[in-house]
Swiss-Prot record:
Membrane-crossing residue ranges in chain numbering: 1-13
Highest classification ranks of the organism: Eukaryota, Sar, Stramenopiles, Ochrophyta, PX clade
Pfam family, one: PsbY
Swiss-Prot/TrEMBL keywords: Chloroplast, Membrane, Photosynthesis, Photosystem II, Plastid, Thylakoid, Transmembrane, Transmembrane helix
UniProt subcellular location: Plastid, Chloroplast thylakoid membrane
UniProt organism field: Fucus vesiculosus (Bladder wrack)
InterPro entries: PSII_PsbY (IPR009388)
Protein name: Photosystem II reaction center protein Y
Molecular-function annotations in GO: manganese ion binding
Gene Ontology biological process terms from the UniProt entry: photosynthesis
Family: Belongs to the PsbY family.
Amino acid sequence: PVLAAASWALFNIGRLALQQFNKIASR
């Protein structure tokens, strides 16, 4: 399940980046 792991990692990274972006944009 390499593809699943890569997809999950990308999803997690994207979600974290989105949270950081929202934190910066809400300023």
